[in-house]
């Protein structure tokens, strides 16, 4: 009866602070020891001892009943508390687990001190690795962002396939450096874009150009004189022909320059007179010369500035020029080339001329 009473007792699980390890051998040893002690007491004890043992068993039964009542009261209180708090339900379910299952679970986990030391070691070992991994991830993300930015800069997109390609104006600086700078090459000055020739309004000013380059007329006159001297000295016909052509071209150029100068002078005088008349109130609108009137005035001024001999030569030259021009415009029959009339029947190789 004593063994059954001991086995019927309720056993609670050890708390986590207890570091004793449960094993099946220890469990088997406890009832055997109790049995042996009971058997020893029963075999070697006397009759008075049996009375004492019965009294002890009676006391144990009463204590068990008291414990059962207390446990029932505790269970009733626990049920009321479970109704109030949901966490108590979890605790109640854990209390119903058998002691053997809890002991096996605790044995598989090992002592608490070892578990704590292992967890702390794992945290210490894992923390530097996590930091290194986080740094590697950040570096990779930064590299991807930079590569995406450089890719966008290198390959600009177009709005459509027909649009022109967008190209960056940035160019890398060359590694070549000029150690010795070459001397500056003297540049030729173009008189067309010379600031001395151009006016303040950036337009061509012929008066300023003539004043700035008046020495060229003297050079041309001296060149013409030298050509005439060479022409007089040379005896070769080919050289004489070339010199004659050069003299004619230079003289024509000088004559054209003088005519342009006369035209500018006549226009300046005419503008001055018209401005004076408008200022006096005799005219409201200025009169602009025609090209034909300008040519006539230029010709009159040319003949006025000539000597009598030069004037006669110029008039004779002009007369011949006009005669040749009229002869070209005249029909062939009136030129005096053919005195007789054209025959009625021409040969096969000749064409009949039409009489005007």
Curated annotation (Swiss-Prot):
* Spans annotated as Disordered: 1-209, 302-356
Q: Where is the composition biased (Basic and acidic residues)?
A: 130-156, 302-315, 323-338
Q: Which GO terms describe its cellular component?
A: 90S preribosome; nucleolus
The record ties this protein, via InterPro entries, to: RRP36 (IPR009292)
- GO biological-process terms attached to the record: maturation of SSU-rRNA from tricistronic rRNA transcript (SSU-rRNA, 5.8S rRNA, LSU-rRNA)
- Function of the molecule: Component of the 90S pre-ribosome involved in the maturation of rRNAs. Required for early cleavages of the pre-RNAs in the 40S ribosomal subunit maturation pathway.
Its name, as the record gives it, is: rRNA biogenesis protein rrp36
Q: Name the gene for this chain.
A: rrp36
């Amino acid at each position: 009866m004593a063994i059954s009473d001991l086995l019927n007792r309720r056993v609670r699980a050890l708390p986590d602070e207890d570091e004793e390890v449960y094993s099946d051998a220890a469990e088997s040893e406890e009832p055997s020891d109790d049995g042996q002690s009971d058997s020893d007491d029963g075999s070697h004890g006397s009759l008075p001892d049996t009375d004492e043992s019965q009294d002890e068993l009676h006391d144990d039964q009463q204590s068990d009943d008291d414990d059962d009542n207390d446990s029932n009261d505790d269970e009733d209180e626990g049920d009321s508390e479970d109704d109030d708090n949901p966490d108590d339900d979890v605790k109640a379910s854990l209390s119903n687990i058998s002691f053997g299952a809890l002991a096996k679970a605790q044995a598989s986990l090992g002592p608490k001190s070892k578990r704590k030391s292992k967890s702390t070691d794992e945290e210490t070992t894992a923390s530097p690795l996590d930091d290194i991994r986080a740094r590697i991830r950040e570096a990779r993300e930064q590299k991807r962002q930079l590569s995406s930015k450089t890719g966008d800069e290198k390959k600009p997109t177009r709005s459509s396939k027909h649009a022109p390609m967008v190209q960056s104006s940035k160019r890398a600086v060359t590694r070549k450096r000029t150690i010795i700078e070459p001397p500056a090459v003297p540049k030729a000055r173009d008189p067309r874009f010379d600031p001395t020739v151009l006016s303040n309004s950036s337009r061509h000013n012929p008066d300023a150009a003539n004043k700035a380059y008046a020495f060229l007329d003297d050079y041309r006159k001296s060149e013409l004189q030298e050509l005439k001297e060479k022409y007089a000295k040379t005896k070769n016909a080919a050289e004489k022909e070339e010199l004659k052509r050069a003299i004619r071209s230079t003289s024509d150029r000088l004559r054209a320059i003088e005519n342009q100068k006369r035209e500018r002078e006549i226009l300046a005088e005419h503008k001055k007179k018209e401005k004076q008349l408008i200022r006096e109130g005799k005219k409201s609108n200025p009169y602009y010369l025609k090209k034909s009137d300008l040519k006539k005035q230029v010709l009159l001024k040319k003949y006025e500035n000539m000597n009598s001999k030069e004037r006669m030569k110029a008039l004779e030259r002009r007369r011949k020029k006009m005669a040749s021009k009229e002869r070209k415009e005249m029909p062939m029959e009136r030129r005096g080339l053919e005195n007789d009339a054209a025959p009625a029947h021409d040969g096969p190789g000749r064409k009949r001329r039409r009489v005007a």
